[in-house]
Amino acid sequence: MDNSTIESSIGQIRKRNGKVDSFNMDKITNAIYRALAATSKADRGLAEELAQGVVSKLMTQGFSASRQPSVEDIQDMVESTLIENGHSEIAKAYILYRHERRKVRDEKMKVLNTQTLDPVAKHFDLNCLRVLASRYLLRNNKNEITESPSQMFERVAILIAIGDLLYDSTLFTKDGNSKQNTDEAHSYLEKLDSFDYKFKIGDYYLNKYHFRSLINHYITLANKGQMKVGFKDLLTKIAAKQFDNYAEKISEYYELMVSQDFLPNSPTMMNAGGRLGQLSACFVLDMPDDMAGIMKSTSDAALIFKSGGGVGINYSDLRQEGDIVASTSGVASGPVSFMNIINTVTEVVKQGGKR
């Protein structure tokens, strides 16, 4: 019996999260092969033979397309098949492998504060998930994680695709001669909550912050005379699924990030499709040579750090240490003293935030 016939006979399996997935005999073969490799007996042919034995036991015990085995059922069958075929050493390696996998799985769920792992969490190693949990995954006001890694990458991918959508040839013109009234678009900013997950591109729903980004992008382009349609007409077109082809873009961006072939900068991961919406990583600020300007730059730097951005500051306008300050008849403390102030402020903000 070939693999395709076997797989169709079993049909599906029940995963730990309760979902049903297609039965794949290669996964059993690969698990056994890893156990063989752990005992320095890496033999693909033997792994395939033992996997066939596991499937035979499953079918003998009545598992079929109408009675799906669970992941645990299959793993128990692997252990018993190895022992029954005289491979006790390999069975021990498999049991240890299974135990280690369970430990990693439990630790991942603890890090993400969840009872189940999505496909991305299963694929990413523990250190990656620790970084995502500490810096990038959204949290509520109780500091509890509120999204999975898959949801985070989807949130980012949707926002990136919104920019592409507005440059669609049916919406965008380069000549700048298309006049649209943006008052209507502005009015939607006052009722964002009413549009949370109301519109979607393909199967991807826009949350209220995606919707806000759509409005702001539209207003920017409309003010340049580059939007061919009014904002209400744009929403009508989205609702009519005229731009569902951009779901492919969302999926493409998503897969690039999940595969780690490409990752955007930190603020984009933190804020895309979120409340702050600040995507830029680097800012340059001037430091004017007066106290009000110095404090304003200090405040701006703190707010940028709070949103996940980084700051470079031009101190060249500040007078050197010891110069006379006419307004107070005192002397200037110099750029280094204000560098220390900025450093202290941003360190405090960094420790309490994501930067």
Describe the predicted segments one by one.
Residues 1-355:
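Extended catalytic cores of very large enzyme megasubunits
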